[in-house]
Every structure is written in C-alpha cells, then in structure tokens.
Amino acid sequence: MGGVRAGNLYGTLEMLILRGLELSGPMHGVGVADHISSRSGGLFQVEEGSLYPALHRLQAKGHVAWEWVKTEEGKRAKYYEITRSGRRAVAQELKGWISSTRAMLSLLDLSAEEVR
C-alpha cells in the first residue's frame, strides 16, 4: 500500500500536529513530520510545503507556541509546543474523530479488533 500525504487528508494535519506535540512534547518541524510518519507506520508523510503553513496557522490560532533552541550540533532550531488552547482544540477534534470512526466501523460492519 502506498503512502498518503498527510496534507492531502483535508482537515487532519493540524490535529495530527497538535496530538503529536501533546504526546511527545516540544519538537522542531522535522521532528513533527518524523513523529507523524513513525506513528503511522510510514503511511502518512508530511512535506514541508504542508507542515510549516499548518504550524503557522496553529500559531496564529494560539494553539502552538515556539522558541529557538540550540541543538546538540550547535545550530538553532525552532521548537514548537502545544498550548492550553491547543490541548482544548485537539480534545474536541479527537471526540469528533472517535465518533466518525465508530460510525465508519458500523457502516463497514467491522469491529475495532478487526482493524488493529
């Protein structure tokens, strides 16, 4: 099965970013993309052209904050962190996804165990 670009999954990229930051803590942009790829078993690939505009939208909404951090290699990297507002937003999004997933499983006559 081929990969899916997370930016092509309309309306999901921001939720995936927020959830990744919530689960793993502050990360730089490449770390966010790697987290999404790793957690999806490589199925979702986030390109820079989708990732950074999404991070900027999340920052504009107050869901993400950032700071410059000096890396082990001595370079500066922008690290993103989920805010309290971002935590509330991702909690709301997750409720919707859980509801939609249950409905899809029912429509497809599948159990949660069958899709694990």
Where do the PLM segments sit?
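Beta-hairpin "wing" of winged helix-turn-helix
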Residues: 59-76, 81
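N-terminal helix-turn-helix DNA-binding core of bacterial DNA-binding proteins
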Residues: 6-50
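Amphipathic alpha-helical dimerization/coiled-coil segments
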Residues: 88-116
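Amphipathic alpha-helical recognition patches that constitute DNA-binding helices
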Residues: 12, 16, 77, 81, ...
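Basic, amphipathic "hinge/linker" alpha-helix immediately C-terminal to the N-terminal HTH DNA-binding motif
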Residues: 75-94
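A positively charged, amphipathic N-terminal helix/segment that binds anionic biomolecules
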Residues: 1-2, 80
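Basic amphipathic alpha-helical segments that dock to polyanions
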Residues: 51-58
